[in-house]
Amino acid sequence: MFLAQEIIRKKRNGQALTAAEIQFFVNGITTNSVSEGQIAAFGMAVYFNDMNMDERIALTIGMRDSGTVLNWDSLGLNGPVIDKHSTGGVGDVISLMLGPMAAACGGYVPMISGRGLGHTGGTLDKFDAILGYQTEPSSELFRKVVKEAGVAIIGQTGDLVPADKRFYSIRDNTATVESISLITASILSKKLAAGLDALVMDVKVGSGAFMPSYAASEELARSIAAVANGAGTKTTALLTDMNQVLASCAGNAVEVVEAINFLTGEYRNPRLYEVTMGLCAEMLVLGGIAQNEIEARTKLNTVLDNGKAAEVFGKMIAGLGGPTDFIEAYDKYLPQAKIIRPVFSDAQGYAHSMDTRELGLAVVTLGGGRRKPGDKLDYSVGLTQVCALGEQISTDKPIAMIHAQTEDDFLEAELAVKNAIKIQSSMPEKMPEIYRYIRAADL
């Protein structure tokens, strides 16, 4: 029998906790036998004194097991259960293509996603833009769509990781969100509760990233890879670039359109293609669908080019209550903003740098993102045709198109976009799309 205050005292004094002590504390979070004040104190003690890898693994497993852990054995799936998670960015529409692409190659992707907050967009918000699509289906429907389509992208259900829900809301109010140990456990407890065979983690780096520096992003990526593998799930983390908008657009309905154009081959933004392929190929290798990256990329290009990935996307949309002809007639079902107008630069030269976070906040200003949880969204607004770094810019060539509902919103977003994209006479240094892979063997 342990006492919550003794566990807090031990961590306050910089000592390592045992797995049993951590399990006891997590149980207390779930059953409310540990008070809000004690959870806040524990969070602050971890923030200042950190946790070693064994502690992080114990915290992740304890939180994962605080609710239902999905099990896919009874469905008789003939492929691996695989998934991807991103730390979030601007124009990060990868999940919408990656899930169907991996499923079309023989994987099963039960993707439990979140909504956007602050400057980062949320995968669920993009699906909420689709008429009829259920982001909170029954567990029976979720399982049915995973089995039949190979992929289902939904929101977190109430019975998954209740400990994280309570802990996170307290961390949010007590300034302990930025702890790598606690971020690792929060992300992974949710992902591993989906009963995965393998996971690929996309950790963003740059001006639109969640972490403030490359070093912090790398530390988080290493922590996630070590803890997930330590908890028994094959995992690789990729560090990818978020120094500019990833797709050609940012918003909700506009990103759904870009995903469809990508899947059908209408248009594939080269940077988006590189990051999507890098993540998806790693999923196939970890899941045993491909022997190596070259074979994985060949399989992925095949399902893109023969239309199978697009077909899977359509099947998932229809299976979760959306239109049956969504791929062919998406413009009938997606909302459109009243004002769609270009924004021009006052300078000529090259797009030299981008404050990606500010561009994400411009989407929030338009009504396409949240300032606080629970805010209602306008799914039609956003940015499209955003220029890429290194692109030649003249005063008569738009740096982006703004989709707004009112003239005032347009003007506010126009100012934000102009301020966020810096034009200079010289070309910027080219950044890689993928900085590095952190695999189990690298730990």
From Swiss-Prot:
Pathway: Pyrimidine metabolism; dTMP biosynthesis via salvage pathway; dTMP from thymine: step 1/2. The keyword Chaperone does not apply. It catalyses: thymidine + phosphate = 2-deoxy-alpha-D-ribose 1-phosphate + thymine. SUPFAM superfamilies: Nucleoside phosphorylase/phosphoribosyltransferase catalytic domain, Nucleoside phosphorylase/phosphoribosyltransferase N-terminal domain, Pyrimidine nucleoside phosphorylase C-terminal domain. InterPro entries: Glycosyl_Trfase_fam3, Glycosyl_Trfase_fam3_N_dom, Glycosyl_Trfase_fam3_N_dom_sf, Nuc_phospho_transferase, PYNP-like_C_sf, PYNP_C, Pyrmidine_PPas_bac/euk, Pyrmidine_PPase_CS. One of its GO terms (biological process) is thymidine metabolic process. PROSITE patterns: THYMID_PHOSPHORYLASE. The enzymes which catalyze the reversible phosphorolysis of pyrimidine nucleosides are involved in the degradation of these compounds and in their utilization as carbon and energy sources, or in the rescue of pyrimidine bases for nucleotide synthesis. Homodimer. This is Thymidine phosphorylase. It comes from Shewanella denitrificans (strain OS217 / ATCC BAA-1090 / DSM 15013).
